[in-house]
Structure formats: C-alpha cells, structure tokens
C-alpha cells in the first residue's frame, strides 16, 4: 500500500466506492478490467489519487473498490466522460450485482 497516500488523507476528502458481485468464473477477467479502468483513471482523470480493490476471503466473487480523490468536482468530471461509462460498463457486464457510493473521510488514524 502506498503509505504516503494514507498519510496525506484528510477529513472530508472524497472517496468513490463500489461493491461488486462478480459472476462465478469471471473473477480474473473482472480484476483485469477493473485494473484497466482504474489505470486509465489514474493516468487521465484530474485529481485521481489512488485506487484499491479488495476481495472477500469467504465469498471470493465479492469485491469492494475504493478510489481517493482531491475534490468532489474531480469525481464529477471523471464520471461525466464517455470513457468512464465505457470502462464501468466493461466491469459491470461481468457482475451479478453492483452498487456504487460516494463517501467523504470522517476520521483518519495513521501510525
């Protein structure tokens, strides 16, 4: 994990999140597509800081994703691009369920 990103996290900082339930047998393809999606975002989207995808150990078709951003305006601009819908759609077509959410950091504890 990029320690410097965590250390720079501040209260109120925007995060995007997704809960993904992937079709059985499609997990590796989903990880590849999600990685392409977020690699594009990191390169091209203003204010994109970091992305992480975590997998449920007990239910391996269930994933959570998080993206940290400089501002809510950056998130809105990212979501308004045609590429966003294309990449998101490629991930979603491998899923039985997907829920998106927008968050703001409420508390930060670092070592």
Question: Which stretches of residues belong to each language-model region?
Answer:
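An amphipathic, aromatic/His-enriched active-site/gating alpha helix that lines ligand/cofactor pockets
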Residues: 2, 36-49, 68-102
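Residue-level signal for secondary-structure boundary sites
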Residues: 26-28, 73, 111
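Short, well-ordered beta-strand segments in beta-rich or mixed alpha/beta enzyme
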Residues: 14-21, 50-79
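Short, surface-exposed ligand-recognition loops at beta-strand->loop->(often short) alpha-helix junctions
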Residues: 21-31
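Glycine-rich beta-strand-turn "strand-cap" elements at beta-sheet edges
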Residues: 1-13, 50-61, 87-111
